[in-house]
Amino acid sequence: MNVCMMSAGMFYEQLLHQTGWSADANGGTLESLGYKEGFRVDVDIPDGTWAEAPSFHDILIFNTGHWWWAPSKFDPVKSPMLFFENGLPLIPALPPHVGLDLVLKHMISFVERRMRTGGIKFFRTQSPRHFEGGDWDQGGFCQHLQPLLPEQVEELFSLENNGTNVETRLVNQHLYKALQGSDFHILEITRMSEFRADAHPSTAGGKKHDDCMHWCLPGTTDTWNDLFITHLNNIKFQN
């Protein structure tokens, strides 16, 4: 009898890499430019919570994006992202979308070098939010009983409209560009999920504001799992 052992794991890190920075009393390049605190983003150093995962697990699914367009957390003045490469700050300071490109470039390369033989790598596209009338801290809501119509989807997510949830498609643009030429598989869950404004906890989430980001269970995420299993079966068939 043959026994097949497969290992998969879950790791949480907001930006895929090492973070955290505060001004040094002795001064430095960033200090001389007036920076006092922020989030150090080492674009070429993976966070320790997952750095060893590629050499151990058989299947890895990555995603990133929401936090890169989160001014409530990464305020460009009070707590900006400060990008480092080879241990040195990148001057002039990079905007988040340029930093994201660098992080994706380095992290994809890192995983491809470290992934165990036969390992399968996925990058999941963005899980869309559905805030209407403002962001989560601005009275945004998502009180729907039915999936959205195509024109409603475009109103919320179209890059031309620059709506509250525009980061969903923006991040996907950067992700698809970064994955060109790699051997990652893409788990495309964005388009199907954009219609499901009715599938969030909304006012039933137990929070002071509508929860239009997380998903009810069971529901949309079960379809993601079905899609994932289909991908695995196709990979098995091709091999």
Specify the residue positions occupied by each region the protein language model found.
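A compositional signature for long Ser/Thr(±Pro)-rich, low-complexity
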Residues: 1-239
